[in-house]
Amino acid sequence: MKNNFFEAVKGKLIISCQALPNEPLHSSFIMARMARAAKMAGAAGIRANSVVDIQAIQDEAGLPMIGIAKTDYPDSDVFITPTLKEMRAVAATGVEVVACQVTGQRRPHDEKLAEIVQQFRTEFPNTLLMADTDTIENALEADRLGFDMIGTTMRGYTPATQGMNIADHDFEYLKELRSQVTRPIIAEGKIDTPEKLKCCLELGCHAVVVGGAITRPLEIATRFIEAIK
């Protein structure tokens, strides 16, 4: 399974099909159709949130998947597949990859990342792990813990990186990350043009995830409306 995923997405686009409960397109049926459209366009894989969406998309698209479960806990700011419970639930769907947040913040119930990674490996030895990171330091920690791939997903979305973008200063952050980690890099987060997608691949990223710029019409329409106000 591991080799198949990496081979399937190498040098290609993975499209994130997600809609949260407060968004107009929140529906497993709609996300599955969104994934079908992504497949028709030539996407190599899908990233999806929640067990029900993942299962609907598996039935509809049949592409390699990165699965997550966004879950809020009162005692932590970590929300992307934050505990072993969510990791297990996502892995049980049969997705090729489970992604979880690795941002150095306290996890719910004070779970320790090293311990839950070790336990997950025991229970799901054939499922790949992706680290959704925000800084070089946290990417290196994920690398050390044996995550199979390093994502830039959380860059710009944590207190330490607020307002930052992987495209800043001619992709300086991505170049630095590439020089320091040993695992394949999955570029993700604020990649909103085809040109940025190409740059990420040219800089050596294994694959690129694009979401909002393709699959969130409310955000896309808002950008256009704001331009003429």
From Swiss-Prot:
<dbReference type="GO" id="GO:0005975">
    <property type="term" value="P:carbohydrate metabolic process"/>
</dbReference>
<keyword id="KW-0119">Carbohydrate metabolism</keyword>
<dbReference type="GO" id="GO:0047465">
    <property type="term" value="F:N-acylglucosamine-6-phosphate 2-epimerase activity"/>
</dbReference>
<dbReference type="GO" id="GO:0006053">
    <property type="term" value="P:N-acetylmannosamine catabolic process"/>
</dbReference>
<dbReference type="InterPro" id="IPR013785">
    <property type="entry name" value="Aldolase_TIM"/>
</dbReference>
<dbReference type="GO" id="GO:0005829">
    <property type="term" value="C:cytosol"/>
</dbReference>
<comment type="pathway">
    <text>Amino-sugar metabolism; N-acetylneuraminate degradation; D-fructose 6-phosphate from N-acetylneuraminate: step 3/5.</text>
</comment>
<dbReference type="Pfam" id="PF04131">
    <property type="entry name" value="NanE"/>
</dbReference>
<comment type="function">
    <text>Converts N-acetylmannosamine-6-phosphate (ManNAc-6-P) to N-acetylglucosamine-6-phosphate (GlcNAc-6-P).</text>
</comment>
<keyword id="KW-0413">Isomerase</keyword>
<dbReference type="InterPro" id="IPR011060">
    <property type="entry name" value="RibuloseP-bd_barrel"/>
</dbReference>
<dbReference type="GO" id="GO:0019262">
    <property type="term" value="P:N-acetylneuraminate catabolic process"/>
</dbReference>
<comment type="similarity">
    <text>Belongs to the NanE family.</text>
</comment>
<protein>
    <recommendedName>
        <fullName>Putative N-acetylmannosamine-6-phosphate 2-epimerase</fullName>
        <ecNumber>5.1.3.9</ecNumber>
    </recommendedName>
</protein>
<dbReference type="InterPro" id="IPR007260">
    <property type="entry name" value="NanE"/>
</dbReference>
